[in-house]
């Protein structure tokens, strides 16, 4: 796939992105493909999962209010690790934008308000962008200008799957994911499976999302001013 990110962003890919995220979190994020930060501190992150074609027929099972209770519990599970790494801990989580299925761009959007122990708050927006053979997860955090919903919606516009790999290109006989979009969303958020039998591979996603990984903006700004790239030594 291709991601059209403005030239105003500083971009890290692969191992460079992994190194930066590890420095500030103390946790490996070796699945990240692209990390980008804009001039005003806004942040993007993208990674792809080769799951097969994700169906959307279980979307009616999604219950945002029920999800939120478990989301809060799961985010707080990460607090012990964050404390060990000298990071602020999660105090509360609420919906900024409840999960929304966009049939035009074959994407799911949602955003969370996160309150921290240092009396700050952030908004983390996410998009699950569906393709023929899997899906791309995009994440967005606002910078100096605050959270802007249009920036979240833009995740599915600046990301383009390669020709014949878009969601609409699916054909009978192609690989189909073991779970639908509702169950995938639940797993991504760290919520219990909507129905029994969710695959173990899906549960591994919980490791990724129990940690709020977007970083203190002033530290990132200073780092990027020094160099466009920082590599692991």
Predicted regions and their residues:
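Short conserved aromatic/hydrophobic patches within beta-strands of well-structured domains
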Residues: 7-13, 155-160
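Extracytoplasmic/lumenal ectodomains and periplasmic regions of secretory and membrane proteins
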Residues: 113-182
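Juxtamembrane, membrane-proximal amphipathic segments and lipid-exposed surfaces
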Residues: 171-178, 221-233
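Hydrophobic alpha-helical transmembrane segments
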Residues: 207-212
């Amino acid at each position: 796939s291709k991601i059209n990110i403005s030239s105003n962003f500083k971009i890290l890919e692969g191992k460079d992105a992994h190194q930066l995220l590890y420095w500030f979190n103390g946790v490996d994020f070796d699945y990240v493909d692209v990390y980008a930060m804009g001039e005003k501190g806004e942040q993007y992150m993208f990674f792809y999962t080769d799951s097969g074609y994700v169906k959307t027929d279980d979307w009616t099972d999604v219950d945002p209010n029920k999800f939120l209770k478990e989301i809060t519990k799961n985010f707080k599970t990460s607090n012990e690790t964050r404390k060990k790494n000298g990071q602020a801990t999660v105090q509360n989580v609420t919906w900024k934008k409840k999960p929304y299925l966009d049939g035009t761009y074959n994407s799911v959007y949602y955003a969370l308000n996160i309150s921290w122990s240092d009396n700050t708050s952030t908004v983390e927006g996410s998009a699950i962008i569906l393709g023929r053979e899997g899906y791309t997860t995009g994440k967005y955090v606002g910078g100096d200008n605050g959270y802007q919903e249009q920036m979240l919606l833009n995740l599915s516009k600046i990301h383009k799957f390669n020709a014949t790999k878009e969601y609409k290109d699916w054909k009978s006989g192609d690989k189909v994911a073991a779970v639908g979009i509702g169950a995938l969303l639940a797993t991504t958020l760290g919520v219990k499976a909507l129905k029994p039998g969710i695959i173990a591979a899906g549960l591994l996603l919980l490791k990724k999302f129990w940690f709020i990984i977007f970083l203190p903006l002033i530290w990132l700004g200073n780092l990027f001013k020094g160099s466009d790239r920082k590599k692991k030594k």
